[in-house]
């Protein structure tokens, strides 16, 4: 009987204890619901003005970290266990994550996303206000470091691919130039410089037999300093030359047998033809007429130079007579038709050789008589000179 009474007393005591604990649990839940009335400050407020803890508490005071309490509610069926979040102190709120990090005037701030609040309620909190959440800050810093390493790897990979693209473009560029249209290249040849026209040497004259003439000119004759006695005589010679060419109807021969109006090409009219202009471009068709006019003037200058430096100049310097007639004949040597008779004879030694100069009176086609020497006839009318020698040659046998 005693044992039965003891068991019943134990059951009654346990039931009374369970009823009291249930009453305490319900009172605690109601009190928790009534006490949660704190809210975080607005997002636009400055980070420096946000309080770390509630009024009356120190800045370094941490929130109360109460262990999770497992409470059992007993109903019709079996008891169900529920986890209830611990109560936070006044002024403390739960952090969901860290969004960004910045440094202002040497102080580090973090953009905090609060749990249960929208993104517009995010605030920048200084590092001192987050001293109780060092684990969240450390995790965020590690994620930043890992993110920087990933970005660097991506940058290195991108820099390795870009040079290959540039190299391909560089190699492909010359190929495009080779496939371009053909380009015409014009090679411009500069005219060969002609020798000075005012330098005359009688040693450059060669007769028909290939022997050099022995006459020499000791001076260099300029274009304006011809070795003539009077300017009036020169003008007279030019006028007579024009009259002779107009009456005979013979065109001026520039490239015929190396002669120019009966004279050898001392300076050569070909130099005027080759040296068309100082430039390198070709002349147009309109400039050819000007070139022809220059050739005629060049022939005139050439005849004047030949008068000053030719073999007749030596004969004129020797003091022979009628030098005007010789000059007239020298300008048109092909018009001589007959040798009348010899006038003078002169022998000289040159290079240990005997040089004989014979002066003849010749008749031109227009009937005028002129004086010519044998050297001039050898170059221009060799057949006429040979016929004269054959007709007038006399053989005297030696005794």
UniProtKB/Swiss-Prot annotation:
<keyword id="KW-0805">Transcription regulation</keyword>
<dbReference type="GO" id="GO:0031507">
    <property type="term" value="P:heterochromatin formation"/>
</dbReference>
<feature type="domain" description="Chromo 2; shadow subtype">
    <location>
        <begin position="332"/>
        <end position="396"/>
    </location>
</feature>
<feature type="domain" description="Chromo 1">
    <location>
        <begin position="93"/>
        <end position="152"/>
    </location>
</feature>
<dbReference type="Pfam" id="PF00385">
    <property type="entry name" value="Chromo"/>
</dbReference>
<dbReference type="InterPro" id="IPR044251">
    <property type="entry name" value="LHP1-like"/>
</dbReference>
<feature type="region of interest" description="Disordered">
    <location>
        <begin position="1"/>
        <end position="72"/>
    </location>
</feature>
<keyword id="KW-0677">Repeat</keyword>
<feature type="compositionally biased region" description="Acidic residues">
    <location>
        <begin position="50"/>
        <end position="65"/>
    </location>
</feature>
<dbReference type="InterPro" id="IPR023779">
    <property type="entry name" value="Chromodomain_CS"/>
</dbReference>
<keyword id="KW-0156">Chromatin regulator</keyword>
<keyword id="KW-0678">Repressor</keyword>
<dbReference type="InterPro" id="IPR000953">
    <property type="entry name" value="Chromo/chromo_shadow_dom"/>
</dbReference>
<keyword id="KW-0804">Transcription</keyword>
<dbReference type="GO" id="GO:0005634">
    <property type="term" value="C:nucleus"/>
</dbReference>
<comment type="subunit">
    <text>Homodimer. Interacts with H3.</text>
</comment>
<dbReference type="InterPro" id="IPR008251">
    <property type="entry name" value="Chromo_shadow_dom"/>
</dbReference>
<dbReference type="InterPro" id="IPR016197">
    <property type="entry name" value="Chromo-like_dom_sf"/>
</dbReference>
<keyword id="KW-0539">Nucleus</keyword>
<protein>
    <recommendedName>
        <fullName>Chromo domain protein LHP1</fullName>
    </recommendedName>
</protein>
<comment type="function">
    <text>Structural component of heterochromatin involved in gene repression. Recognizes and binds histone H3 tails methylated at 'Lys-9', leading to epigenetic repression.</text>
</comment>
<dbReference type="GO" id="GO:0000792">
    <property type="term" value="C:heterochromatin"/>
</dbReference>
<dbReference type="InterPro" id="IPR023780">
    <property type="entry name" value="Chromo_domain"/>
</dbReference>
<feature type="compositionally biased region" description="Basic and acidic residues">
    <location>
        <begin position="22"/>
        <end position="49"/>
    </location>
</feature>
């Amino acid at each position: 009987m005693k044992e039965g009474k003891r068991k019943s007393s134990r059951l009654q005591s346990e039931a009374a204890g369970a009823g009291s604990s249930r009453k305490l649990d319900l009172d605690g839940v109601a009190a928790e619901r009534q006490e949660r009335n704190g809210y975080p400050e607005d997002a636009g407020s400055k980070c420096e003005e946000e309080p770390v803890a509630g009024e009356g508490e120190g800045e370094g005071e941490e929130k109360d970290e109460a262990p999770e309490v497992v409470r059992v509610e007993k109903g019709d069926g079996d008891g169900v266990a529920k986890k209830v979040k611990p109560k936070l102190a006044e002024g403390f709120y739960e952090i969901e994550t860290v969004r960004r990090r910045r440094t202002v005037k040497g102080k580090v701030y973090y953009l905090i996303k609060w749990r249960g609040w929208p993104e517009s309620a995010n605030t920048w909190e200084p590092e001192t206000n987050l001293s109780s959440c060092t684990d969240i800050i450390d995790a965020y810093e590690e994620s930043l470091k890992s993110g920087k390493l990933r970005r660097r790897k991506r940058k290195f990979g991108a820099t390795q691919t870009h040079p290959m693209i540039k190299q391909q473009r560089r190699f492909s560029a010359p190929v495009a130039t080779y496939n371009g249209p053909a380009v015409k290249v014009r090679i411009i040849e500069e005219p060969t410089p002609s020798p000075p026209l005012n330098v005359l040497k009688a040693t450059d004259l060669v007769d028909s037999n290939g022997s050099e003439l022995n006459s020499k000119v000791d001076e260099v004759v300029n274009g304006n300093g011809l070795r003539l006695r009077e300017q009036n005589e020169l003008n007279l010679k030019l006028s007579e030359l024009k009259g002779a060419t107009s009456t005979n109807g013979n065109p001026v021969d520039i490239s015929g047998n190396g002669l120019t109006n009966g004279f050898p090409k001392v300076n050569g009219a070909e130099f005027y033809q080759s040296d068309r202009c100082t430039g390198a471009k070709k002349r147009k068709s309109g400039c050819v007429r000007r070139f022809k006019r220059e050739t005629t003037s060049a022939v005139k200058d050439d005849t004047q130079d030949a008068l000053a430096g030719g073999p007749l100049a030596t004969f004129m310097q020797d003091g022979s007579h009628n030098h005007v007639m010789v000059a007239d004949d020298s300008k048109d040597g092909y018009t001589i038709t007959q040798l009348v008779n010899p006038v003078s004879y002169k022998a000289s030694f040159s290079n240990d050789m005997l040089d004989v100069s014979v002066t003849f009176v010749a008749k031109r086609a227009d009937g005028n008589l002129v004086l010519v020497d044998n050297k001039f006839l050898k170059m221009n009318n060799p057949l006429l000179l040979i016929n004269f020698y054959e007709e007038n040659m006399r053989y005297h046998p030696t005794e």
